[in-house]
Structure formats: structure tokens, C-alpha cells
Amino acid sequence: MSWNTKWVKGIDYPSWGDNDVYKKTISGGYLINGESPKEAYTRVAKTVAKRLYKPELERRFFEHIWKGWLCLASPVLSNTGSDRGLPISCFGIDVADSIMDIGNKNLEMMLLAKHGGGVGIGVNMIRPAGAKITGNGTSDGVVPFCKVYDSTILATNQGSVRRGAASVNINVEHPDFDEWLEIREPKGDVNRQSLNLHQCAVVGDKFMRKLEAGDPDARQRWGKLLQKRKATGEPYILFKGNTNKANPDAYKSNSLKVHMTNICSEIVLHTDETHSFVCCLSSVNLDKYDEWKNTNLVYDSIWFLDGVLEEFIQKAKGRVGFENSVRSAEKGRALGLGVVGWHTLLQKNGIAFEGLLAQFKTREIFSKIKIETERASRALAETYGEPLWCVGTGMRNTHLRAIAPTVSNSKLSGNISAGIEPWAANVFTEQTAKGTFIRKNKELQKILRRLKIDTPKIWDKILKDGGSVQDIKELDGWFFDKGKLTKDHEDGEPVKNVFKTFKEINQLELVNQAGIRQDYIDQAVSLNLAFPSEAPPRWINQVHIEAWKRGIKTLYYMRTESVLRGDIAANAMNPECLSCDG
């Protein structure tokens, strides 16, 4: 549907949404049968409060959403309280080493994708090529079964808008790893190509220690992995050791392990033959942090997400293909409250992404989120009880925090930065399934207006420079001092530093900040890395190894110059992550 021009700002839609980015995005598939944004927010708030048997919470939930404090994941906004889909559309399934389970998981994936699911698939248990099988034959390995899943996901529609999406997870030490690494390349035997699957390499501590010790096989596998990431952006990486060492008490007491991640790499939950994880997500808006930091927003958001999960359980129960997902959701009730607008928050306060002030802000915000989410889960346990995997912990949920990419959510939140990621460019054109936009960094635009240089000439110059302001001479000599714009104040932060783009930020600084953040996140973070095309392999290797050493659980895309130009910056992010765009 198109935007209804009769809708009134502040009545039918929030005042902060009075911009083309918000209007085109929310009217691009999120609203049902002509409902206004306000009616959509009401639908969601009412439904979730009802699932909690707490109708008095409806108004509180609605206010958080209306103010732009709580930003709903795409399926939560689109489907909660409707009969057109489920409020969760991101799943993870693990495949056992038998033809029966390989086939059953293919059916499960097909049925999940039919209902709008993006699916992570773990194939590490499948025996390698050349291994013996029943009947005196030998296995053809993992790759042909990836082809089966590739064909299934391509053939299965997600609603009427987009095709199914899936990622395949395999251990870097699996004997088929080298061949698996090439399945997305359109060359060789077409029956061994999987052009529609995404990939994730699962990397353990044992492997990383062998790599550090100079083991030739480990170095060869790691080198190929990084070469492929530089060339294509993938595979993602799951540091399995970091993940399982940090598992919550509920997992440790039940001997539950993480073997894989989801299609956007922020979910690290247990999977096996009978348990498939679900991604129950939404985000708090850091652009409005000063408005809500002394409120109950984070606490209420966990109540909200627990209600969303209950909506999923009740609607999915009894549906063929959802048995493993419902079973996992009921036993663990894992949630993933994240954030959107981190870089916007820093820029609004005149803080450079690199440096101590950003680190202090990281600790301030994410420690608060950790405390408040756990307080909420304890209150939920007192009210509704502990699920099976949480018995004895005093908690309602095994997990509470995960930071998704939030690409669409950044638009639905008033044109702010996505997740915890730096802006790829300060201005760019973006073509998505939800519309075409010219997106300008609104915090930079405020500065340019104040300096009376918010002109087409300046923006054209920034666009020509790939979204960078480093060659804008009019910004020379301007600084931020305690968040205020000043002239020739060399003890302050240069404006150009504050508005550095992704590739201009030292990636070791980004990883260091991510390591601080990871200490407060019990799931994972969709963490991209960005390098110039001429970045030396030694530097790329150093950053990746440092990510492992800092305890980071997952790495998402590795972006290079080809996907960082200002005019195509938005295409660097996987569009299929609408599945879990929290």
C-alpha cells in the first residue's frame, strides 16, 4: 500500500516519523488493510498485553512504541495480532547424520520458509565425502545436501514479498570445508553449486590455538576463509569456544551447547535433532536514550518480548514443521533485546566512534540494559514460573539480549544508524523492497545547517567522495567540546572525526569496543567489519584474530570497497535479514 496523505502527524503517525524514509518504509508492507501506523502499534500492544494476561500493560507498550523508544522487529510489527503470519520469522535447525534426518530437516526448513522464515542450518554432523555408509558405499559429503537445501529455499516463497533465505553452518575443520567454501561460486559442476545459500564457518578455540602455533593445515584453512570473506563478504564466523564458555547458567546446568548461528549471526542458542531455535527480537532506540534512560523502558521491553514469544508459541503450536521450534521456545523462552542507533547517539553527543568516550558510553548503556533485562526476567519468573531449562535459576528466560542488524528498523525509527554499526556513508541512495531513498545523516545535516553550508554543492561533494566528509574544507577548525559545536577548540573532538564513515574507522578500535559490549550481551551481535580494497592480508588477519581474543562470538559480513561506495552503501547488508531485523 502507499502512504495515506490524509493521515495526520501526531495523530495517525508519530511526529518523529514525518520524513520520507519512515513513510515509505512502514507503508511498504508493515500495515494491514489500510491501517495507520497508530492502529498498527495499537494492534501489537493490545495483542502482547493479552498474551501476558495483563491488559493494563497495553497502554505502556503502546507509549514506548509511539515515542520511538521501543523499535519492533519486522515480523513483530507486521504480523502480531494478525492472521497473515507469525511474530517470529528467524529460525535455526541442526541436521543429524542420517538420510531420514536430512530429509526431515529439509521439510522443516520448507515449512518454516513457507511461513516467512529465514533459516540457519547446521550441517556439521553430516559425514564427509569418502566416509563409509550403510550398504558398503561411501558418502558424497556435505555439498550435495547443501544443494538440496539451496533448491528448497529457492523454491519456497516467503509470503508474497520475498523468497526464502538460509545460511549453512559448518566447522572449519570439517573434511569437506574446502569444497563447501566454493559452493556459492558459479563454476564447476552445477549439481554442487548452492548459489542462494549464505555461509557461516564455525571456528573453535582448539583450531585457533593451532593457528597461533603455526599449524600448516589450520593456516591454509584460515587463509582460504579470510580470502573468501574479502572477495564475497562471507562466510560469517561463529567463534564456538567464545560462545559456549559464556553460556548462561541455565545452559551449563542442562549441558546445552551452541553449534551454529542464524542467518544474521546474532543468535547463539542450542540446537539438536529435536530442538530448533527461534529469534524473538526487538530493539531500544539509542537515538532517544536521553529520553528513556531513567524510565522502565528496558524492563518493560522484556515483558513485551516474553509476550511476543507467547504469541508465537500459541500460534505455531500444532503447525506441521514448527514442533522443534515450539519445543525449544517453551523450554528456554530465549529473547533478544537489542539496540538501534548507536552511531547516531555518539554523533548527537559529539563523540567519535574511536576512543575512550565511546568505550565509557558502551559500558554505561549496556551494563544498564543487562541489569534491567535480568530484573525483568526474574519478575516474569515470579509471575509465570520458570520454564524447564531455567528451573533453579530464578529466571524466566535463558537469554535476554542480542543485537540484530536492524537495517529496516533504522528507517522505521526516524532515519538513524543501524544497530551498533557505523554509518557506511554520510549520504547515499538506497534501493530496497520497501522503496528508494536518498538517505542523509541527519546529525551531520544539523551541523551543516548550523554552519550555513547545508547546500546541494556540499552534499554532492560528500556523495562524490563516497559519503566521506574528510575533504570538506568548510568543516576544518570545528570541534565538539562536551557535545557542543565550537570553533578552534583543539582540546575538543574534531567534527571530521565524529563523522568518520565505517571504512575510515580503525577496525581494531571497532573490535575492542565490540569486545567491551559482548561482556554485557548473553547472545551475540551482528558485527560487520569494513576494509579498503587495498587492505593488506596481514591487517585483515590481525583484526579477525583480535576479535576471537576479545571474546566476540560472531562476525557477520566483511565489507570491502566495492560495497562501501556511498551510492550503494545500503546493498552491503543482506536484505534477507528482514527475518530478524530487530
PLM-predicted stretches and their roles:
Residues 85-88, 107, 114-117, 162-166, ...:
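Short, well-ordered loop/turn elements at secondary-structure boundaries
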Residues 91-92, 120-122, 169-171, 236-239, ...:
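Structured core elements
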Residues 258-259, 263-272, 313-315, 401-582:
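Catalytic alpha/beta core of large soluble enzyme barrels
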